[in-house]
Each structure stands twice: as structure tokens, then as C-alpha cells.
């Protein structure tokens, strides 16, 4: 049996799903597709950005309720949620550490469980050092992304690239 860990950078995956007409990235359906025959998906990790609410009590409560709903839905789909709180920047923008949190969680879990593969749903070059380190440990990484959006350094580090649009077509992730 082949053992895999599925790690999802949720924000860009949700964007791709919405562009295709779906409401969200179908975590459970993609996980089941990855599992296929003779594959054990040991864990599914997914980042969930907690947005910064306005400073009034109603906005804070609404923000927390939305986060909790999405967290519960992801957990019901079999994912372990990695909370990534956003911070307000002085210029009014927001910064979150979701990539870094996913890198740390994925790397530590992979080094502990020693799967044959990590399936990484992400396209950002920030993940390339993690993929190289996994490779040094004998763990191959399949990257799930749009090939035209995939950072070149992540493409070089990956064992293989799977087109996210092909996967969403297979699982019925709208079109």
C-alpha cells in the first residue's frame, strides 16, 4: 500500500474552484480521488486563513462564526485544519502566515510518518525548499496546480505535476 499525505494551500485552491463555478475546493472528493486503489492517505492538512474583522463587536462575531463554520466543514471532509490568523498591516492591508504554517506542519508530519508521497495542492515557490527537503529524505512530492501558474522552482523540486483543472473535471468541481 502506498502512503500519502495531502497538504492543501486552501486560498488559491478555492480561487481556482470559484473560477470554475464551484463554491469551494472539494477537499473530500479530491482526497478520495488521490486515495484511489492501494493508496492510504494518512492525513489531509489544510490552511484556513482567519480574516481580521472590523473593530465592532458584530463584525468580530460574524467573522468568528464564518471561520468556525468553514473549519467544521473541512474537518467533516476529513481534513486537519491549520489556523492562520491574518494581521492588519499599517498600510491597511493584511498579512497571514498560511504558507509557512503549512510548510511546518507538512514537513514535521512527513518526517514523523514517512509516507512515500506528499500531494501538495499549491503553486507558490515558497514551498520549493520544503519539497527539496522531503526529497532529501526520500519522500516524493506530487504538486497539484495549474501548470501555467506553477512557480518554476517548485516545478523543478517536484516529482510530478498534476493539473488541478483535470482533477476538478474528474471530481465534478464545476466548469
Regions found by a protein language model. Give the residues of each.
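Nuclease catalytic cores that cleave nucleic-acid phosphodiester bonds
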Residues: 62-175
Amino acid at each position: 500500500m502506498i502512503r500519502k499525505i495531502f497538504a492543501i494551500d486552501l486560498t488559491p485552491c478555492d480561487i481556482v474552484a470559484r473560477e470554475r463555478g464551484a463554491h469551494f475546493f472539494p477537499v473530500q472528493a479530491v482526497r478520495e480521488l488521490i486515495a484511489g486503489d492501494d493508496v492510504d492517505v494518512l492525513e489531509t492538512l489544510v490552511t484556513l486563513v482567519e480574516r481580521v474583522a472590523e473593530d465592532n463587536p458584530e463584525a468580530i462575531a460574524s467573522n468568528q462564526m464564518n471561520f468556525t463554520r468553514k473549519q467544521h466543514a473541512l474537518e467533516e471532509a476529513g481534513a486537519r485544519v491549520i489556523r492562520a490568523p491574518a494581521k492588519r498591516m499599517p498600510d491597511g492591508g493584511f498579512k497571514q502566515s498560511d504558507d509557512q504554517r503549512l510548510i511546518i506542519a507538512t514537513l514535521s508530519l512527513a518526517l514523523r510518518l514517512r509516507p512515500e508521497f506528499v500531494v501538495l495542492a499549491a503553486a507558490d515557490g515558497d514551498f520549493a525548499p520544503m519539497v527539496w527537503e522531503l526529497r532529501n529524505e526520500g519522500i516524493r512530492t506530487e504538486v497539484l496546480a495549474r501548470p501555467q501558474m506553477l512557480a518554476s522552482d517548485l516545478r523543478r523540486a517536484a516529482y510530478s505535476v498534476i493539473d488541478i483543472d483535470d482533477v476538478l473535471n474528474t471530481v465534478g468541481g464545476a466548469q
